[in-house]
Amino acid sequence: MSPRTAAALRDGDRSLREHLIATAGALMAEEGAAKLTVRAIARRAGVADGVLYNHFADKEELLAHALRAHVRGAERALGDLPVAGDATVEANLRAHLAYGLALHRAILPTFAGLLAHPVVLTRFAALTPTNTEWRDRLLTYLHAERDLGRLSSTAHLDAAAALLVGACHETVFSALVPHAGPAPAPSLDDVVATVLEGIGA
C-alpha cells in the first residue's frame, strides 16, 4: 500500500473500496453529481486516479455505490419514522410528509444531475433492496394502521401514498427547473387533512 493510500485510510479499519465510496458520496452531497470526475474523487480520497479501477469496473459502478451511500446518509440523518399505533394518524402522516420533503430536498438534486447518465441510475436501482425506500415504508405504515382499524377498511392506500409522495416531488422538482419557478410548498396540515378525508376511519 502506498503512503498516499495509507494516509487516505487513517480513519480506521475501513477498506479502500469503502473509503472511495464514502469519498464519492461526500462529494455528491457537497457538489452534486453532474461534474463528478474520477480525478476529483481520487484527489479527495488521497489516491492516484488509477486506484479506482482496482476496485470498480468503471466510474459508473463507483457512482452508483456512492449514490446509494448518499441516499442512506440522508435517511440516517433524518432519523426514524413513526410507528403504526403510536400518537395519532394525523401526526404520524405529518411526520412522514416532513421526512419525505426533507429527503427529497437532500437527494433529488443529485438524481437530477445524473439524468444524463442512465447507466448510473440503473446500477443504483439494482443495488437498492426492494421495499426499503421511503414510499415503501410509507405504504407499509398505512397498511399497518388500516390493520389496527385506525384507517378505513376500504381506503385506497396506494393512492394515498401517491398523493403524499407527489406533494414532495412537485415541491422539490419545481425548484430544480429554472424556467418553471419553484412551486410554493403545500401546508403539511392541508395535505394530511386532504388525504385523511379519503382514508380516515
Range-by-range predicted roles:
Residues 68-74:
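Short, basic, alpha-helical segments at the C-terminal edge of helix-turn-helix-like DNA-binding modules
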Residues 65, 79-106, 157-164, 188:
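Hydrophobic alpha-helical connector segments
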Residues 75, 103-113, 121-148, 158-162, ...:
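Amphipathic alpha-helical packing segments from all-alpha helical-bundle domains
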Residues 151-152:
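Conserved hydrophobic residue
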Residues 9-16:
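Short, Lys/Arg-enriched anionic-surface-contact patches
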Residues 82, 95-103, 111-120, 194-199:
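Helix-loop "lid/cap" segments that line or gate small-molecule binding pockets
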Residues 19, 23-61, 65:
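Helix-turn-helix
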Residues 1-4, 91, 95, 102, ...:
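C-terminal peripheral helix-coil segments that are non-catalytic and often amphipathic
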